[in-house]
């Protein structure tokens, strides 16, 4: 429960993963049944056997394994779907019924995710144009307004109706040639008399057909031929036939005219029709009503549609996507069953339902969906906040949606209908800005695919305010009070007026005319934006960066909750699943680092804790018990904190003392100066767990072997292997060490032996090993402690099944120069220098500050919220208080934030007897001293406690150097990228810079020895070994030779000439 203000109502924030749960439950309860009901009865060619499924009695079996085991064994956490099936013999009139296994359906776990092949995956919501009809206007090539009505089908296909200057109505199917509306209606089965009886403007319909047109609509056959000729773009004179009708029915009327359940509802509402909702196809009546509306638009009646309004969008949730895939799997199963029945009859076998049905179509369909579909993504588990935010994303991208390159600015922009539904702040940066959003805290997906948001209904009859959820199409008809002090206070005088929202406009009206009011200031923000204190004082662009950067924060080894927060930290931590919660009341009878044993209601349960588990971003997930033996607990109490939670609250960073002042230029351009205390006291130390794996295969020469006897490798590299050839638990490993020893057999010819091997065979008769060493070695930057080793084989027990060995290595990373840190207001920076404590600037009580920021980073960025947080954090630290402040507190009175901060600083100054905490001449600022000289700085500066995060962009993952490595085959230049041990590219601008400094020899080295001059590279190697001067490179580098060859392929001959230094005569040389 949250309570906002003294007179506000109480309400509960919905679970942050509720949208995912509701979607999956809707699929299990309704989607499966709907698709199974549509499965057809299958007959053989002689119509003697009939197969059918009885979908209403389907069963889902509880999985045999636990979630944790599915992750470790890299298998799918799924449930088997069983459906009764019947096989009916028409000749004997008897039926054989059996329960058949249709396949496995991946289940959703408590995080709102699915585990597929051991990987947590999540399906995000997609926003699509809702099916129905939309009216718009545009200019033709003559600059004259043209009105069009666009009919969008359920799968996204478009057909257009347009009216020209002569008031003739044309239909354009899939942007191909246009045909008369009368031809389309006749082809759909309406006669001219029926058309004229069902329209409001029959004289307009009669005015434009000439004799030729009247002949085309004289009969249904002529209309179908004309329509087919235009639709299929065929020449000549096609002849009417049943096959032509079937083709048209299949290609156009079934595919492009299916409106679906939502489209039928939208069409009825827009055109004032009363067609039954189960009639989901486009009818002639729809087309004629749409044409009537179009004529009305031409004469200034009716309103145009705003395509970007959320009432014209629909959410394609996890339920819709899973149902679509289930329907696709059943179509594949139908083809398999049909083929199997025909095969059994042909070979005179007696089929049974279990013989006919295979589980492969359903299982493979879902595995390919979760693995390949753009809306199925690997769950981002950097920290607990990231997990819950990922499930609440909404995307315009994906199949049937937009692309980042084609989406217009208008679609990306904030729309008034987003209020309380889609967060106006939290979106991705870059090419997808505005296309990937985040649902607001209170938003939910309704039954018709619309996003709903709650309001309090103000009623004169009842003093109790009722909370109602409204879709985007409904809240336009109400006066909604804006969230200021007037609207949020009861007992207002009737004559007072205040701001309100009505039909996307802002008005000032009397309180008695208000219908609805907001329930909470957070209502229109996402979770990420709602965790920013004093967000109302920040520029929206910086708030956007902060929302994104909080999701990149690394869980620290010693977590700490923020002094200044917004009150949502507890709910975010709870819904993330990072903490262990008591599911019943009872008494703790045993606790240690691995499990907690709880006794209650006469039985005892053991609750296992997460121990050093790796996330897919290589951060650590670990639970620390917070209860002691003998303690009595109630249901819902915290048993253990997660990696980034403290006391059940989200704790992503640390409260550190900061000062805003320049320091010798080390914090210019967003750089950050930090104290060595943060390093030595493990303030910003984090653990990272990396996974390395290797498989053994059976080759044509025999099986690969895991062994610790590896020839031609130094014993030092094998020092950590046990007798099986696998690294020992607890070993400290460095770069290049062997983690798993593996030999691959190969055939060796006599000529491929080394000379010493041939000598041993000839003199002593010793058989030299023909196996090739293919060990798993620790790559660069992977040093650490081995914390887990898993050796397993895929199920089946065959020798051909590969063995899989996984080694988990933990790294302890202290903060260092090059790491990225950020606050909660978009204030980010790279650590530029780590100063000794005695050199840092210190406060008047002798305390050195921990971080020094550049004050120039505040005014131009307009993120002043960090000033309020910084000063209030200092007061809270001195008073031992934690603050949870709702944003937009200026709605109570002007300058409310500043008054709160100054009053708390004044109280802290009085209680601690430190007058420097609040000095009236420059409140919030203080004079501080230079740690190197002891002299005070010239100006007082802002000091305080800020909550700073360490982000996942760490220098250990990015820094890279190359001494030797692989070269590209074509250009002979070093490869690109850190993963391939690539080189640093010297491009045009870098060459110009070197030219500008006149460093000719360095430039020549860059472009020849260090790059693609093959002969010069070899000479450098030889000269380095034997000693001596390195000769100048002669001839052209390989990339120039490549250019010459490409020009020759275009019949352009190119040679180069070398001018001799001695006689300046030109010696012609072939490239």
From Swiss-Prot:
Its EC number is 2.7.7.6. The lineage of its organism: Eukaryota, Viridiplantae, Streptophyta, Embryophyta, Tracheophyta. It is found in: Plastid, Chloroplast. It comes from the Eukaryota. Belongs to the RNA polymerase beta chain family. GO terms for cellular component: chloroplast; DNA-directed RNA polymerase complex; mitochondrion. One of its GO terms (molecular function) is DNA-directed RNA polymerase activity. In plastids the minimal PEP RNA polymerase catalytic core is composed of four subunits: alpha, beta, beta', and beta''. When a (nuclear-encoded) sigma factor is associated with the core the holoenzyme is formed, which can initiate transcription. This is DNA-directed RNA polymerase subunit beta. Keywords: Chloroplast, DNA-directed RNA polymerase, Nucleotidyltransferase, Plastid, Transcription, Transferase. Gene3D superfamilies: 2.40.50.100, 2.40.50.150, 3.90.1100.10, DNA-directed RNA polymerase, beta subunit, external 1 domain, DNA-directed RNA polymerase, subunit 2, domain 6, RNA polymerase alpha subunit dimerisation domain, RNA polymerase Rpb2, domain 2. SUPFAM superfamilies: beta and beta-prime subunits of DNA dependent RNA-polymerase. It comes from Nymphaea alba. Its main location: plastid. DNA-dependent RNA polymerase catalyzes the transcription of DNA into RNA using the four ribonucleoside triphosphates as substrates. It catalyses: RNA(n) + a ribonucleoside 5'-triphosphate = RNA(n+1) + diphosphate. GO terms for biological process: DNA-templated transcription.
